[in-house]
């Protein structure tokens, strides 16, 4: 009904430019309403968008009700020719740039599910890339390598171990950065 009111004809069954535009406007309008209300009652709004939905969700970061904007640059090891460092770094830089331009905080989610056996160390590479790109809130999806899900990693225990190591590594880098800044005055 809304589509027909806006465009003067029923919504087609195929994904046309009008349908894409309507979808984007609908998503943005919905988030604008709910985040504005949440802001009104004193809540903070943090949103994360998937990279493959950026066309439809790119306007969300600019909403007044959004405080923190994040992305999840999942490189899917073994399934694409994505270098995890390059892929995560470039996407994280774009998110940081967008958030900074809008005066928002940002965060990055690192893939911790559907990791094939033997690719677990790419998680460390991805954490480093996000940190090097300026992210300081870096999280992982999913708990324990997704062991209870159909999208579980092949070696969930190893994924969980590496996620902990990667987190400890960037935490150490963070505190080293603080200490090195303090040492500059001596």
Task: Cite the ranges covered by each PLM segment.
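Substrate-binding cleft of secreted/luminal carbohydrate-active enzymes
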Residues: 73, 80, 102, 106-186
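Acidic (Asp/Glu)-rich catalytic clusters
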Residues: 59-65, 93-103, 128-134
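Polysaccharide-binding and catalytic clefts of secreted carbohydrate-active enzymes
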Residues: 1-89, 94
């Amino acid at each position: 009904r809304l589509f027909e009111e806006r465009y003067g004809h029923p919504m087609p069954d195929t994904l046309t430019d009008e349908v894409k535009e309507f979808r984007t406007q609908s998503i943005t309008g919905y988030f604008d309403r709910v985040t504005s209300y949440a802001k009104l009652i004193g809540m903070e709004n943090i949103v994360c968008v998937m990279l493959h939905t950026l066309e439809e969700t790119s306007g969300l970061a600019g909403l007044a009700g959004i405080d923190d904007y994040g992305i999840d640059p999942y490189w899917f090891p073994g399934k694409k020719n994505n270098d995890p460092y390059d892929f995560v770094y470039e996407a994280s830089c774009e998110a940081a740039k967008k958030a900074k331009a809008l005066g928002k905080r940002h965060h990055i989610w690192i893939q911790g599910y559907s990791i094939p056996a033997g690719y677990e160390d790419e998680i460390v590479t991805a954490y480093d890339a996000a940190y090097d790109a300026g992210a300081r809130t870096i999280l992982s999806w999913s708990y324990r390598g997704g062991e209870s899900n159909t999208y579980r990693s092949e070696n969930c225990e190893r994924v969980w171990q590496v996620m902990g190591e990667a987190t400890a590594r960037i935490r150490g880098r963070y505190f080293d950065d603080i200490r090195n800044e303090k040492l500059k005055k001596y």
